[in-house]
């Protein structure tokens, strides 16, 4: 059998084992996860690099001077007005000249301080970016290198041991079951009226402030997390596993974990996390769009066992009319998910997020479920303004978490099926006489 056929056949076994491990085991408490190791590596590497790439001295002075440029200009205007008054009084000519000389010297010093502050800022930015780039390289080399070594050792002992080990690794890197369980941990308290319990549960899976959220806001946060992480947590790593096996999976998870830990636009990581954030955008560019298209396709099958909500606000009429009409509460509704609305909202809103990738699956989910997602959100006590996606024909309810999870599962299974079908075709073509 040709080498390509053998590799494709082994990859099929790896994917099947990964699916079994993910669905059967998930991420139980107390069981070590590879991402924990990657996270510890990132933290220690960051600490070492921050000591190596020291922030230039004068950072406090930099902020003081830059923030007070306007005060210096105001002082200049006040001094100019005082000069005009002094020149009218000949008795104070000498004093005015001395004062002007002192002021000119002070202006020169202020200008020099501002220039030094700007130079310090540029130097600090360069050091931070360089340190962040080095961190990305070190983490990727260490994580993928260790996995390569371990898998090679397993294959050397026995080829099937290598396949099983790689399949278990891939299964641990997927988050289908764990994300479903985390989402249901939010849904169940909401259905029972336990808003505080749901708030505690949702705080475990989102980065936003959860204290301001009411029941609808909690359900909305859970739906957004499931929709976004359909790609980040399941289909994107699966995409790279189909192409490159366990090495592709660990490489992607390392990039994604770095973005999650240091890819923030705050004072600490604005420059240090630039390399990680941009690499994550590149790695997710194709998987996020593929996930969105697959999610649109699975909307062709109606939900079963989930009651359809009443949509009472507006629906889009035919293209020829191109306008909206009001609906009465007793108007018959199309069953969810709505494939046409999913495609329409995806085309319209997929670029509304600051990230080039995160709104891809979120916009599909918003359209399919007739919801309005994103919008203003609180992070660390500060309100962040975000564009809204979707038409919001109805309020978000706890059962929408179930619907979002169903879309995630369907999308993931479809990608599994496509990947295995492609690999089977590759085996057949490689063995063609």
PLM regions and their residue ranges:
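Substrate/ligand-engaging "lid" and interaction regions
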Residues: 256
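Intrinsically disordered, low-complexity repeat regions of secreted/extracellular protein precursors
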Residues: 67-121
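Glycine-rich phosphate/dinucleotide-binding loop and adjoining beta-alpha-beta core of small-molecule
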Residues: 259-260
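Hydrophobic alpha-helical transmembrane segments
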Residues: 2-67, 74-77, 116-251, 263-319, ...
């Amino acid at each position: 059998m040709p080498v390509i056929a053998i590799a494709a056949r082994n990859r099929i076994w790896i994917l099947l084992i990964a699916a079994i491990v993910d669905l059967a085991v998930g991420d139980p408490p107390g069981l070590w996860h590879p991402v924990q190791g990657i996270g510890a590596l990132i933290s220690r590497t960051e600490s070492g690099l921050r000591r190596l790439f020291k922030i230039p001295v004068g950072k406090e002075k930099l902020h003081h001077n830059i923030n007070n440029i306007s005060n210096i200009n105001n002082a200049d205007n006040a001094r100019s007005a005082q000069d005009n008054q002094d020149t009218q009084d000949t008795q104070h000519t000498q004093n005015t000249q001395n004062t002007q000389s002192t002021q000119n010297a002070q202006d020169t010093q202020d200008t020099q301080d501002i220039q030094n502050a700007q130079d310090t800022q540029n130097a600090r930015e360069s050091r931070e970016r360089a340190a962040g780039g080095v961190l990305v390289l070190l983490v990727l080399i260490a994580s993928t290198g260790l996995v390569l070594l371990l898998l090679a050792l397993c294959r050397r002992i026995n080829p099937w041991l290598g396949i099983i080990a790689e399949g278990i690794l891939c299964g641990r890197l997927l988050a289908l079951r764990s994300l479903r369980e985390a989402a249901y941990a939010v849904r169940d308290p909401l259905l029972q009226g336990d808003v505080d319990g749901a708030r505690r549960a949702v705080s475990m899976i989102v980065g936003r402030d959860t204290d301001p959220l009411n029941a609808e806001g909690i359900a909305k946060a859970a739906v957004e997390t499931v929709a976004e992480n359909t790609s980040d947590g399941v289909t994107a790593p699966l995409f790279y596993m189909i192409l490159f096996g366990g090495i592709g999976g660990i490489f992607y998870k390392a990039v994604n974990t770095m973005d999650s830990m240091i890819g923030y636009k705050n004072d600490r990581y604005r420059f240090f996390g630039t390399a990680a954030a941009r690499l994550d955008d590149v790695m997710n560019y194709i998987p996020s769009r593929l996930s969105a298209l697959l999610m649109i396709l699975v909307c062709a099958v109606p939900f079963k066992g989930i009651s359809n909500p009443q949509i009472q606000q507006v629906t889009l009429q035919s293209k020829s009319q191109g306008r909206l009409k009001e609906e009465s509460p007793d108007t018959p509704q199309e069953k969810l998910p709505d494939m046409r609305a999913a495609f329409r909202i995806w085309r319209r809103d997929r670029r509304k997020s600051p990230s080039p990738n995160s709104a891809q699956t979120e916009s599909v989910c918003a359209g399919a479920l007739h919801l309005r997602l994103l919008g203003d959100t609180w992070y660390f006590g500060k309100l962040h303004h975000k564009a809204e996606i979707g038409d919001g024909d109805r309020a978000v309810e706890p059962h929408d978490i179930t619907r979002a999870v169903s879309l995630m599962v369907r999308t993931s299974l479809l990608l599994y099926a496509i990947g295995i079908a492609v690999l089977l075709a590759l085996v057949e073509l490689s063995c063609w006489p």
